[in-house]
């Protein structure tokens, strides 16, 4: 998408969380076009369909770091998925904005949304962006890679139980999270085995889901992302036993079989195995 060919939208086309509009206007970010063409900051990830960058702006409280996800070539299947979920055209950025607010309303931590905007044509998304505040914490996989070998057995157990109970709380809120990979989970400051946890990368999240099969598919994604160099069978049993609910009426063997089956599907689909 060549954003230079589009007329600038009015500032009202962008939805801001309270208190942020003037901060971004001062930095020259006032329209959808401004955000989509912004070249400041540091890119931290991209593929054919989206880009992620981080940048710092001056605010009344001092410099603040933000993250922006830009959906530059929205995938048709994702546009159709949001249409089914919301029963109206909805950009990928608005979808993630709404899901972040839903999680926070349920008491489940995630990045705090700042603003979003989109360019729609005939009900189809041409591109969109979503800006969040920086999460004060550390990605779970980074924490594991740096500290796992030095954690005591009790601290490891504490972290595993916390993780299992966190995922159970997400599911008990009726939320399905297909991308429940360890790298989409954060430990909040002060970082440690008992830290509160948070989710990121929300655009495939779904609400109002209670089906056991879908919850087990989520857990299969988590299983896939747990590297054997850190998580042996005993560690995984601690985690998943902390998650399990008596009302699901599944034996441990049936539960593990279904989770592992989904993890195997993901391994076959991925070109590269996870590493951290």
Regions found by a protein language model. Name each.
Residues 140-150:
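AlphaC helix of the protein kinase catalytic domain
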Residues 194-272:
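C-lobe/activation-segment region of protein kinase-like
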Residues 136, 182, 204:
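Short, glycine/acidic-enriched loop or turn micro-motifs at the edges of active sites
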Residues 172-182:
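Catalytic-loop of the protein kinase fold
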